[in-house]
């Protein structure tokens, strides 16, 4: 054995080095949060639960262009529309199968009027599979519930679009 190794062994230098690291780590600030009681900060680009937005006058934003349905790689979106008296289209059915959805965000990017968005809600577990089949009413309710946050997130992300 080399003399330096004997010296380290006698004076427990390897042990003291490890102990030094452990003591430093004890006094560092904690990185974890106490999850259901504390929530971490969410990015404005977070892809959570889907929502359909309305204009400030209460009219639905969706113009039934079906771009989101066409671009969805998982084919999770189904849209049906009818024609209004003035010639424009109205969405009669807007369904998203959340079991198929891969949360890629392509539907949100393709929408020309920011009608379909992915909101900040990540706590939407259910007890049955049927609850993961979102219809137009459920999506509009989500949009109404999260409108303030959604509008702020879109405004914050506007420079990156």
Curated annotation (Swiss-Prot):
Binding site for [4Fe-4S] cluster 1: 62, 65, 68, 111
Record: residues binding [4Fe-4S] cluster 2: 72, 101, 104, 107
Gene3D superfamilies: 3.30.70.3270
EC number: 7.1.1.-
Domain 4Fe-4S ferredoxin-type: 52-82, 92-121
Keywords of the record: 4Fe-4S, Cell inner membrane, Cell membrane, Iron, Iron-sulfur, Membrane, Metal-binding, NAD, Quinone, Repeat, Translocase, Ubiquinone
Membrane association type: Peripheral membrane protein
Taxonomy, superkingdom: Bacteria
Reactions accelerated catalytically: a quinone + NADH + 5 H(+)(in) = a quinol + NAD(+) + 4 H(+)(out)
Cofactor(s) needed: [4Fe-4S] cluster
Entry annotated with the keyword Membrane: yes
Main location: membrane
EC class: translocase
Comment on bound cofactor: Binds 2 [4Fe-4S] clusters per subunit.
InterPro entries to which the protein is assigned, alphabetical: 4Fe4S_Fe-S-bd, 4Fe4S_Fe_S_CS, NADH_quinone_OxRdtase_chainI
Role played: NDH-1 shuttles electrons from NADH, via FMN and iron-sulfur (Fe-S) centers, to quinones in the respiratory chain. The immediate electron acceptor for the enzyme in this species is believed to be ubiquinone. Couples the redox reaction to proton translocation (for every two electrons transferred, four hydrogen ions are translocated across the cytoplasmic membrane), and thus conserves the redox energy in a proton gradient.
Family classification: Belongs to the complex I 23 kDa subunit family.
NCBIfam families tied to this protein: NuoI, PRK05888.1-4, PRK05888.1-5
Name used for this protein in its record: NADH-quinone oxidoreductase subunit I
Lineage: Bacteria, Pseudomonadati, Pseudomonadota, Alphaproteobacteria, Candidatus Pelagibacterales
Gene name for this UniProt entry: nuoI
């Amino acid at each position: 054995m080399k003399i330096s190794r004997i010296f380290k062994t006698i004076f427990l230098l390897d042990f003291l080095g490890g102990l030094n690291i452990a003591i430093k780590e004890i006094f560092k600030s904690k990185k974890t949060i106490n999850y259901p009681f504390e929530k971490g900060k969410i990015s404005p680009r977070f892809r959570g639960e889907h929502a359909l937005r309305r204009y400030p006058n209460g009219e639905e934003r969706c113009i039934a262009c079906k771009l989101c349905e066409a671009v969805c790689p998982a084919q999770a979106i189904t849209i049906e529309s009818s024609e209004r008296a003035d010639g424009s289209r109205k969405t009669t059915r807007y369904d998203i199968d959340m079991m198929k959805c891969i949360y890629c965000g392509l539907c949100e990017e393709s929408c020309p009027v920011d009608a379909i968005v992915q909101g900040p809600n990540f706590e939407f577990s259910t007890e049955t599979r049927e609850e993961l089949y979102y219809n137009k009413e459920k999506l509009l309710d989500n949009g109404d519930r999260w409108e303030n946050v959604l509008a702020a997130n879109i405004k914050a992300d506007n420079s990156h679009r």
